[in-house]
């Protein structure tokens, strides 16, 4: 697996879960002898929703909600077979979306 790179993107609504999962991935990769770049924090996406409170009139009465999507990027350079096996067996939090690409 020489001259390869594994790029891992993590997404989630809770930044603490993402940071914890990122720390587990980095620790596992370093323990198996791979070179790690990151974690790199990517821009947080903020989605804002405005909802009318009143069912009929009073347009001034509104509630505002915000949904933040936090993202992190980890590059594993020159992974070994042990690294790939350890990452496959890694159990991450349920609130974290993981995308893995080989390059």
From Swiss-Prot:
Keywords from the UniProt entry: Ribonucleoprotein, Ribosomal protein
Any one GO CC term of the record: ribonucleoprotein complex
Molecular function in Gene Ontology: structural constituent of ribosome; tRNA binding
PROSITE patterns, alphabetized: RIBOSOMAL_S10
InterPro entries found in the cross-reference section: Ribosomal_uS10 (IPR001848), Ribosomal_uS10_CS (IPR018268), Ribosomal_uS10_dom (IPR027486), Ribosomal_uS10_dom_sf (IPR036838)
GO biological process: translation
Source taxon at top rank: Bacteria
Subunit and partners: Part of the 30S ribosomal subunit.
Role played: Involved in the binding of tRNA to the ribosomes.
Family label: Belongs to the universal ribosomal protein uS10 family.
Name recorded for this polypeptide: Small ribosomal subunit protein uS10
Originating species: Shewanella loihica (strain ATCC BAA-1088 / PV-4)
Gene it is expressed from: rpsJ
